[in-house]
Regions:
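Gly/Ser/Thr-rich loops at beta-strand to alpha-helix junctions
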Residues: 1, 64-67, 241
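N-terminal basic/disordered segments at the start of proteins
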Residues: 1-21
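General beta-strand structural signal in soluble alpha/beta enzymes
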Residues: 18-19, 58-61, 111-116, 161-162, ...
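Conserved mixed alpha/beta catalytic, RNA-binding, or beta-rich assembly cores of soluble enzyme
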Residues: 1-2, 9, 94, 110, ...
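Catalytic domains of riboflavin
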Residues: 2-4, 24-25, 100-112, 116-128, ...
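N-terminal glycine-rich phosphate/adenylate-binding segment common to multiple enzyme folds
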Residues: 43-118
């Protein structure tokens, strides 16, 4: 995802600078862009690099895996704001990202989101694949949105699977791919009796979420997971969801006979 955003910026004549986390980014792909490597705990080094590159606008992109405290090597810039960093780490993922973002904003930077810098990567409203949801799927979508709305304040997950009005799985730390794999296993074990081709994956940002950070994302792998789970399609919030490689995703959905629905916010 960081590289797709960087490509989008480059195509519009904006030269991005990547600050890549060691152990999290693909070195070969990072090499395509102007970049610097930083480690978790090097907030001071990162801040100096941002200023040396003349970067005022910053965006967090990608999955942030929480390291064990023993793996973090703090520099002086991090130690200086250790209380605020620790407070951010104690919360959920949304709290962590927004907490670090607030620290950077207090240092004079501006945190932006994909909606600000690469709106072309967001899901449009309406159905974008050939297949369309039937009345049962529409009801499942409504149920999924209701469930996610209720769960949002608890920072549990951004996705739920609903089949014939029944909530069969909610996303947790495993992520959406793991959620879909779990549904596939439940179906294989006979725990899901509904026939294949019914049910919906619904994704939405949490109600308490800062939309500059960690927007829900769908792509080809999501479509493959939905097909493997025996569902009918996916529904996400238009303008609040990243559609990674949207054309390839649509083609994959059409091959599998799945719908992709962008819901009004």
């Amino acid at each position: 995802m960081p590289f797709a955003v960087a490509d989008s910026l480059s195509q519009r004549g904006i030269a991005p600078v990547l600050f890549a986390l060691r152990g999290a980014c693909d070195p070969d792909r990072v090499e395509r862009f102007r970049h610097h490597w930083i480690s978790v705990g090097q907030l001071g080094r990162a801040t100096k690099l941002f200023r040396s590159e003349g970067c005022r606008d910053l965006i967090f992109i990608g999955t942030l895996l929480r390291p064990a405290l023993s793996e973090i090597r703090l520099d002086w810039g991090t130690i200086r704001v250790l209380g605020r960093v620790w407070a951010a780490f104690r919360g959920g993922d949304d709290h962590l990202l927004s907490g670090i973002g607030r620290i950077l904003e207090q240092d004079g930077f501006r945190m932006v989101g994909i909606r600000d810098v690469a709106p072309d990567m967001l899901m449009p409203e309406g159905n974008i694949a050939r297949a369309t949801p039937d009345p049962a799927a529409i009801a499942d979508i409504a149920k999924g949105r209701e469930v996610l709305g209720a769960l949002g304040p608890f920072d549990i997950g951004q996705a739920v699977v609903v089949i014939d009005g029944h909530v069969v799985a909610v996303e947790d730390i495993e992520g959406t791919d793991g959620l879909l794999a779990r549904v596939a296993r439940l179906r294989e074990a006979g725990r899901i009796r509904a026939k294949s081709g019914r049910g919906v994956l619904v994704k939405a940002p949490k109600s308490s979420q800062d939309l500059r950070f960690d927007l829900p994302t769908v792509g080809v792998k999501t479509i493959e997971g939905v097909a493997g789970a025996g569902l009918a399609g996916i529904a996400v919030i238009a303008g609040h969801t990243i559609a990674a490689d949207s054309q390839a995703m649509i083609e994959a959905a059409d091959r599998a006979g799945l719908f992709i629905q962008g819901l009004p916010a």
